[in-house]
Amino acid sequence: PFGPAAGPNSQLAQNIIAAYFAGARFFEVKTVQKMDGEELARCVPRPCILAADEGYNQEWSTELEVPQAQNEYIKAWCALKVLSKVYGLGSPDGFVFNMSVGYDLEGIKGEKVNSYIDNMMDASNTAQFKECLAVLTELFPEEKDFIAAISPRVSRSVTVSTLHGCPPQEIERIASYLLTEKGLHTFVKCNPTILGYKTARTILDSMGYDYIVFDEHHFNEDLQWADAVPMFERLQALADSKGLEFGLKLSNTFPVDTTRNELPGTEMYMSGRSLFPLTIEMCSRISRQFNGKMRISFAGGAEFFNCDKLFAAGIW
């Protein structure tokens, strides 16, 4: 199973549908948070994405309000159920929608994001779900019984997205809340800074990315390996006690300095193929630490040329 990680490419229903037709079956839909819409858009300098080679982006990149995002995901969910059956593209139950929420526990427990989570877990009472069933029945009357039986449970899993510098205690509180209070299979997104400055610098230099500039402050402020391992052990035990799955999303983007006017501002976040060597090193360390038993959702420079090798390594 593979598909788009949370980002602008998994924000609109038509993009999710296009990804499905291209073979994607796992969709980590765009992250939602309490600050949204125009309020969030005003905080993002433009342009906010550059992908000439390795990828760079500014923090955040959405103009949708949380209810609008929810509607996009419900539309995509219902459309894929019908399209998969009508066009014989695979099992109507053969794909997964994974929520992504951030960026602190207060915001996640607030009315806006809490309602989103509840509605994604059960969309049956939402106006959008009811409208989708009505429209699809009109378009495909021969499938009315199938359409009426479409599950309103759009998502049963979530990825925790936190800002760089988020304290480990806050990360654990968020994940624990989602496991215990929401009953969701939960993945925690990790930052490449967990590798340490020296390792990250050595890896990127050896791969020809010596021109990418960063200092040590994010490495000092972000989650440390010594704090991460026992926290992940506790969260795994908690998930096991609830009959749920726990895992790690590898990896978040990598904060670097803006030195060549790539994007506005002094700092940006790296992704794409230059992130791959850092993320695969994270996978290796975590897999060794947890004897290959830690679930990993990989999203750090995965592409056509390395997907087969990732699967062969047992990352899927």
Label every PLM stretch briefly.
Residues 4, 188, 248, 286, ...:
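Conserved, mostly hydrophobic/aromatic
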Residues 196-292:
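Glycine/Thr-rich beta-alpha phosphate-binding loop at enzyme active sites
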Residues 1-2, 23-25, 182-186, 242-246, ...:
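Short, well-ordered coil/turn segments that N-cap beta-strands
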Residues 166, 170-183, 187-200, 221-225:
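Extended, H/D-rich, highly charged conserved domains that either
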Residues 25-37, 190-192, 308-316:
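Glycine-rich phosphate-binding active-site loops on the catalytic face of alpha/beta enzymes
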Residues 6-10, 252-254, 293-306:
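Glycine-rich beta-to-alpha transition loops that act as phosphate-gripper elements at the mouths
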Residues 13-19, 175, 301-316:
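Catalytic cores of alpha/beta
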Residues 1-183:
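N-terminal capping/small domains of soluble enzymes
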